[in-house]
């Protein structure tokens, strides 16, 4: 059996066994929590959703949504600027040193478009499979960490690292950082 086909079947079965929920902020009262508002209509695997209630006066709920809705509508997005100039930082403006890791694996700024597409593809797949970890939550939203793997360009083997994302309503995840560490 073709390995790619086998992996696709395995992933489909894994996803069909998951329960997904949509976070709903109930608009009651005059005051609203910024964290709750930022989660409104965001989708999570039930077992990896933020704890509800978030606080003593929380009126939020989670509602089950069909796996098919998630599978058909989820999307991973990233801005090209997260790779060039941010990741490779050719002018040393950001001074984060993230470019050193990618350069040590054989990647250059000319690989930015490929990295963008590959990280989006893997980010979406891992999100759909529930392979993410919750990060910080505040009024800007819920962050998640997703591990991706790319081939080394300057040798054999692969390298795996953490990417950072923000969960947005309707099944969208948006890249915050293409490299959040090993």
Label the model's feature ranges.
Residues 1-57, 63-126:
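Domain-core detector
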Residues 50-65, 160-174:
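C-terminal edge-of-domain segments
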């Amino acid at each position: 059996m073709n390995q790619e086909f086998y992996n696709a079947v395995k992933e489909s079965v894994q996803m069909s066994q998951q329960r997904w929920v949509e976070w709903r902020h109930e608009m009651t009262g005059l005051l609203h929590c910024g964290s709750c508002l930022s989660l409104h209509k965001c989708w999570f695997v039930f077992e990896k959703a933020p704890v509800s209630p978030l606080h003593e006066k929380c009126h939020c709920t989670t509602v089950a949504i069909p796996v098919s809705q998630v599978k058909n509508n989820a999307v991973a997005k990233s801005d090209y600027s997260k790779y060039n100039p941010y990741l490779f930082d050719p002018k040393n403006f950001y001074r984060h040193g993230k470019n050193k890791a990618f350069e040590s694996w054989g990647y250059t700024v000319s690989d930015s478009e490929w990295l963008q597409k590959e990280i989006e593809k893997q980010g979406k797949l891992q999100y759909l499979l529930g392979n993410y970890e919750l990060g910080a939550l505040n009024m800007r939203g819920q962050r998640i960490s997703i591990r991706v793997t790319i081939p080394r360009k300057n040798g054999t083997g692969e390298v795996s690292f953490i990417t950072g994302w923000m969960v947005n309503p309707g099944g969208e995840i948006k890249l915050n950082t293409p490299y959040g560490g090993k």
